[in-house]
From Swiss-Prot:
This is Phosphomethylpyrimidine synthase. It comes from Cupriavidus pinatubonensis (strain JMP 134 / LMG 1197). Substrate binds at residues 237, 266, 295, 331, 351-353, 392-395, 431, 458. The gene is thiC. One of its GO terms (molecular function) is zinc ion binding. It comes from the Bacteria.
């Protein structure tokens, strides 16, 4: 349902866009915090009862992590032109270390605000931005290192635990909460839901093992954490280009992405109206928004990398920080001396940001200005609490180029920059590859942990083979599940259109679901507390032929239902004890249930006799022939 309407049609966005949505058989619930304005959302999936000979046995509701914000709350009115409620406004103001500016600090921002040519695109409900008071640092890391537990940290603790500790004493959840031991591969995961406390979150932020990307100007944000010792998160990309996609479509894609489970969104726009597109997305986004500021800076030069300047880039950082961008991808590790190391690669430099900075370095024969001005960038970041996503500008673009000197040289420089950012108490995550065959993935995680001091790793896949254009959501999902288990904190999704074109809504959905699978598989492998609850509930529903519950407990209920109904569309098939794969006579689960029923119906004496024969068999050494 991609739209190609011009940006000028944005006036009709509110009527065009399906803003509200409801998940099937679900309710929006909130976990209360220590103060009335801390209400942490989660989704509860309702189940039908199990039919037995003794009557119906109820099945308990299943709580799941929710990224959809107010869009799935039937009690909240969504007005895209007004933006979402300013959830964090009071928290930020009462800390007393910020000030509301009299106007925009960015020259470009002021120009756009006063340009009559963009008046019809402008978000009308803008307020003046905030900035740290002189000498103040407003980053979550700074507060954490001072021993302060912020409302954002408490919010994250409640969100990560889902209040599961309350379920462990309830008999109806006992079987559902069974979980295989995980292997956290050295990570310090909480062992039980009750261990996920605000103090646990504060400590993870203070050490740099996790970040809470939360710009003080993105007050609509529902705080979340990215870190090795939390749930594995996923990022979804959107953004217009010079050849396709309208402003309204990007807002629609944002809402669509969080519906399917994107934990953060990166706006990678390179086409028209980048500033206005970003404003509308931010004001209506409950999840953190990241950008690559060099893209917009390049747009300001007319696309000529050689004309980039530090002054122009600095103005772009301030412009975006005052809009509320939560994390910046900064390609400060692409050093002049690393560029020649890519000469013998099969695919050279595939990162857009990396290639821009490499071209600038070669054109001027100077060191990367993002590297030389890094301390000044840190000063901007801590004034707005923007997190670094230190870009892997020299990531491999094919498996042949994986783990080479250029890639790992840059990674070591990112570790150096991480230490420098932490001296400013600025939050950092590290971007990673890319294209890496399975047997070389572990080395990427090991190198990141070693050289970047356990700062959260944020990887694009990696793709484990290069032979499947059109299916790279699968080739990358395989790598993502593996590296997520090994310790990567956030996985950047890949869609089926990767390497082929700009994704549309269905591509976005496909990519997000693929990566939700990868992230959940990683959580199971690590042993995240309660991760297996949803699996157990769905497996029980499957065995009991509760088809509606199977659909609703899945990551994509619509897809599951449509596949089932393609061959068995009748409503009666929703209670049938078979599907079209095996039919009514060959369903293994149906046969197993019949065996159980038969065993249960045997006289007590017959059951006792079989037990005696079993004991006799075991005493003889379990030998069939003697």
């Amino acid at each position: 349902m991609a739209r190609t309407a011009p940006a000028a049609s944005f006036e009709s966005l509110e009527s065009d866009l399906d803003q509200k949505f409801a998940y099937p058989a679900s309710s929006k619930t909130y976990i209360p915090g220590s103060r009335p304005d801390i209400r942490v959302p989660m989704r509860t999936i309702l189940q039908t009862s199990t039919r037995t000979e003794k009557g119906e046995m109820p099945n308990p509701p299943i709580p799941v992590y929710d990224t959809s914000g107010p869009y799935s709350d039937p009690d909240v009115h969504i007005d895209l032109k007004a933006g979402l409620p300013a959830l964090r406004e009071k928290w930020i103001a009462e800390r007393g270390d910020t000030e509301v500016l009299p106007g925009l600090s960015s020259e470009y921002g002021r120009d756009r605000a006063n340009d009559p040519a963009t008046a019809h695109l402008r978000f009308a409900q803008l307020t003046n931005p905030r900035r740290a008071k002189a000498g103040a640092n407003v980053s979550q890391m700074h507060y954490a290192r001072k021993g302060i537990i912020t409302p954002e940290m408490e919010y994250v603790a409640l969100r990560e635990s889902l209040n599961l500790q309350a379920l462990y004493d309830k008999p109806e959840y006992k079987a559902l909460l069974r979980q295989h031991p995980g292997n956290a591969l050295g990570a310090g995961l909480p062992l039980r839901p009750e261990d996920i406390t605000p103090e646990f979150v504060r400590n993870e932020i203070a050490t740099g093992r996790a970040i809470i990307p939360a710009n003080i100007n993105h007050t609509e944000l529902e705080p979340m954490a990215i870190g090795r010792n939390f749930r594995v998160k996923i990022n979804g990309n959107l953004g217009n280009s010079a050849v396709t996609s309208s402003l309204a479509e990007e807002v629609e894609k944002m809402v669509w992405s969080i519906r399917w489970g994107a934990d953060t969104i990166m706006d990678l726009s390179t086409g028209k109206h980048i500033h206005e597109t970003r404003e509308w997305i931010l004001r209506n986004s409950p999840v953190p928004i990241g950008t690559v500021p060099i893209y917009q800076a390049l747009d300001k030069t007319g696309g000529i990398a050689e004309d980039l300047t530090w002054e122009m880039f600095r103005d772009t950082l301030i412009e975006q920080a005052e809009q509320g961008v939560d994390y910046f991808t900064i390609h400060a590790g692409v050093l002049l001396r690393y560029v020649p190391l890519t000469a013998d690669r099969v695919t050279g430099i595939v990162s857009r940001g990396g290639s821009i900075m490499a071209k600038w370095c070669l054109a001027h024969h100077k060191e990367n200005f993002l590297y030389t001005h890094f301390d000044e960038i840190c000063e901007i970041m801590k004034a707005y609490d923007v997190s670094f996503s230190l870009g892997d500008g020299l990531r491999p673009g094919c498996i042949a180029d994986s783990n080479d000197d250029a890639q790992f040289g840059e990674l070591r420089t990112l570790g150096e920059l991480t230490a420098k950012a932490w001296k400013h108490d600025v939050q950092v995550m590290i971007e990673g590859p890319g294209h890496v065959p399975l047997q070389r993935i572990q080395a990427n995680m090991d190198e990141e942990l070693k050289h970047c001091y356990e700062a959260p790793f944020y990887t694009l896949g990696p793709l484990v083979t290069d032979i499947a254009p059109g299916y790279d959501h699968i080739t990358s999902g395989i790598g993502a599940a593996n590296i997520g288990w090994m310790g990567t904190a956030m996985l950047c999704y890949v869609t089926p259109k990767e390497h082929l074109g700009l994704p549309d809504k269905e591509d976005v959905r496909e990519g997000i679901i693929t990566y939700k699978i990868a992230a959940h598989a990683a959580d199971l492998a690590k042993g995240w507390p309660g991760a297996q609850l949803r699996d157990n509930a769905l497996s029980k529903a499957r065995f009991e032929f509760r088809w509606e519950d199977q659909f609703n407990l899945g990551l994509d209920p619509e897809r599951a239902r449509s596949y089932h109904d393609a061959t068995l569309p009748a409503e009666g098939a929703k209670i049938a004890h078979f599907c079209s794969m095996c039919g009514p006579k060959f369903c293994s689960m149906k046969i197993t249930q019949e065996v159980r029923d038969y065993a249960a119906s045997l006289p007590k004496e017959a059951q006792q006799g079989m037990e005696e024969k079993s004991i006799e068999f075991l005493k003889k050494g379990s030998k069939i022939y003697s």
